[in-house]
């Protein structure tokens, strides 16, 4: 990286005490190692997440995989090879239809009628967002329809939407098949008129390239589109004018999301909590000649609908990847599948950055938890890999699923001879920060008075690996 030498400075907290698991609700089943990061380089964080670490604000933690109740496997998607599935295309088309025509999907599982953005009022001074009363938003259930037993004999029975195929009509055919048939008929008529045999061999169908992710995202909209959607990338920096100008609106959106989607109390989603969780990042903003134009670091990717923020994706841009941290959005737009839509946009963003920085070609989705069905959606962004918790090698998810079906914890790399190539070899070479002086742990240990802390330092260094141990400064009092 360009610029003066920067160091990562951490305080290691160890691990072993169980905490309540947010996935299976086990009171003390969540076990992890943790450390507080005062500052961190993007390269060090890249290497740490490639060893199973993950940050929440400035706290960096690593699940104790063979002991924790819900093992969490780091997952990454090969962004350059990604092709949207049918469900992904449906989500992209749904958003495009909403932007073009202003139609919100109905019939969602939450059973609520979603209000439009125009039901919101943003006061210029306080920026407090209010919405229409929720009374009357509950959708009434459809009345039961008594279908006659002899449908074709009832002259007053009309087939309607949602009632299946109309038996009185011929089966539907694909539009492209009908167009192909009409073209063939015209060609036969033309050749017959010219005295050529009307029996014409149909031209072999040309292989069409399937629409890619960017084709759906960049689809042209009508001039009179009902809405306008703009995606802005804002650095997490309180000295950045765009970040500070939108900060209060982001805070309020976060609180609304947490209370509606996760059932938090107002005290649990305060401004200070928002700042600690989604704004306080240990990552130092960095730039590099072969890196992306906006540099590396932590960013908020804001989705502005008609001039107001409706969703924010918190991401870290690292040397080899875009790492998804969190997403929050306006609950009234839940039917637009904003979680999946933002992930698709972030994959496209990764591909865009790769054109500027060739090494930056992966999209990290955080942790994959196979034992938690709600988290399995992350495995739908293919091709993707899971990180082996013992060798720290990447394994295609298709090879991992059968193992995880048999056991919550698994050594995903099935090569018995494979090992951790960055395993700790010499703890004495780990760097420590003691009384503002940087020194190898071996030198510090010779000076240290009192009981030995070698067991703790050995554990820390083995978890971060030899390379990181020789770069990261472990604070020693």
Language-model features: where?
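Short amphipathic alpha-helical interaction elements and helix-loop-helix interfaces
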Residues: 54, 260-264, 352-356, 384-387
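A conserved beta-strand-loop-helix scaffold within acyl/acetyltransferase catalytic domains
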Residues: 4-6, 56-70, 78-83, 88-335, ...
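Eukaryote-specific, cytoplasm-facing alpha-helical/coiled-coil scaffolding segments in long proteins
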Residues: 73-75, 280-282, 402-407
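Alpha-helical interaction elements in eukaryotic regulators
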Residues: 40-44, 246, 250, 270, ...
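Active-site/acyl-donor-binding loops of N-acyltransferases
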Residues: 356-420
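Noncatalytic N-terminal accessory/assembly modules of large enzymes
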Residues: 1-50, 58-61, 66, 80, ...
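Aromatic (often tryptophan-rich) hydrophobic motifs at membrane interfaces
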Residues: 302-385
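A residue-level signal for conserved active-site and pocket-lining positions in enzyme catalytic cores
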Residues: 48, 254, 378
